[in-house]
Amino acid sequence: MEKQKLIKLIDVAAGRKKADLVLKNAKIVDVFQAKILTGDIAISDGYIAGIGGSYQGVVECNYTGKYVAPGFIEAHIHIESSYVSPEEFSRVFIPRGTTTILADPHEIVNVAGLKGLDYMVNAAKNAKMDIRYMMPPCVPATNFETSGADLYADDMEDALKTGEVDGLAELMNFPGVINADDKMIDEILMAKKYGARIDGHAPQVVGKDLNAYIAAGPANDHECSTLEEAEERLARGMYLLLREGSVTQDLRKLLPIVNTANSRRCLLSGDDVQAKTAINKGHLDNSIRICIDEGLNPITAIQMATLNPAEYCGLNDRGAIAPGRRADMVVFESLEDFAVEETYILGEKLSQGNEYLGEVNYYPIDSVESSMHVKDFTREKLQLHLNSDKVRAIGVVPGEVLTTEEHVTVKRDGDGNFVYNDQEDVTKIVVVERHHNTGNVNVNLLSGYGIKAGAIAISIGHDSHNIIATGTNDDDIFMAVNELIKQEGGAVVVKDEKVISRMELKIAGLMCNLPAEKMIAQQDALDEAVHEELGVPDNVNPVMTLSFMPLAVIPKLKITDKGLVDVEKNAFVSNELD
């Protein structure tokens, strides 16, 4: 802060000068003491000068009867999962009360390397939201797949040194950490060299393995899906992120762990939240409503989205309505309904109701636009030869990124090739490498997705984001993949060799360069086509569910362009049962 601005802030706080803006007679949510205060909020140059006593301002607004809480801070999220650019993310999520995010851009960095990070950083400069980034440490996430880039510790040093990133993002390669893999250790030491925070990712890791993982440096985990996992992490000093995303929704399951003794070690997080979800249901505001609905003290829930993440992330200039803090604020009428009415960032009102009030400018996307590099993709590569009728299939678990290992009996033709049986929910699942023209195409089996006709192909396949497709017949799968390549990414739905819906994601094949509303219209049409025409059940999110099938750092079975991975064994396995 400049000297003259600091002097002015002090003068306003002391009542010697008028504030730029005063919110009069507000019900102030005191997140330090978990209570409600009544008084004024005086703001100078975007910062809170004082609260309580009667202040005078150049502009004064009557907030009698209105609650004012700190703006929400998201400690771990992937902008790419919203399917919109950073600028659009800011526009869509601000009306939901989100004012600061710590984003992990490992999706686009896995596709485009450091130029992907550069794009995200520059695009964020156009956003009113404070978008901060963590450095992705797992590019690629594992050695079981082909990514668009490979990053090592030396590649990260400049960004860590200059503060372009706030720390090291989730250490997804937990087997590498536990087994002291050189690449993982070098990256951890690079982060520690600059005193940077390290985020965790350790699904189903327990006991001594968890001790080893935490000893390496990760300070939080958002991958807990059971109370036992949550308790074990809290007992070992980790911060617990209670996740409520578009697909993975663990919040209600984990809330019973939260009590007065540990609540300040608990944070609310979205991880992967589509723009459509934010508009229709909300973001952290929705998580707070769930907490309240489940009986948690409303102020405790607000702490978990404000003060707690501020302290965890080392952002001591925000997270509370208090002197010297950023005037990032949300306004609402009821602690029971908790509907955000207004959002302020640095003292500027940026939303009223669901309407965003600021301007939006966009950074050029040309550096991350052409990302589909596929060669030698033929229909013949979609054949799946099996040496047995008894095989493994990846089992979809609706609402989870975890999968199961299903043992199924399938039909084969005279040459031993898989034949789709419309009486069984088992289809081909295909990954086509799209970064280096390797020609890699891998075919395995999928159970539980529920598709009954046609095919869908997408360019979102966590975390290396190769093309992933599933369908009931090779003709439709082949056409869907080829159409996806032509449109430079997104999603394509085909039935009877006709494209019936598509969603275009031209930014690295991950994000749309259109306004969120236009993207959502495409997404809604695509979801409807998949549910109505292809028969996928309503409890399966068509794109996001499929996109996690290649994520070979979350158990159990996952598919990559190189083969079928048993994550628990940290090894490839065959389609056939041993």
UniProtKB/Swiss-Prot annotation:
Presence of the UniProt keyword Hydrolase in the record: yes
EC main group: hydrolase
Cofactor: Mn(2+)
GO molecular function annotations of the record: adenine deaminase activity
Full protein name: Adenine deaminase
Organism expressing this protein natively: Ligilactobacillus salivarius (strain UCC118)
SUPFAM superfamilies membership: Composite domain of metallo-dependent hydrolases, Metallo-dependent hydrolases
Family: Belongs to the metallo-dependent hydrolases superfamily. Adenine deaminase family.
GO biological process, one term: adenine catabolic process
Alphabetic keyword roster: Hydrolase, Manganese
Catalyzed reactions per annotation: adenine + H2O + H(+) = hypoxanthine + NH4(+)
Upper taxonomic lineage: Bacteria, Bacillati, Bacillota, Bacilli, Lactobacillales
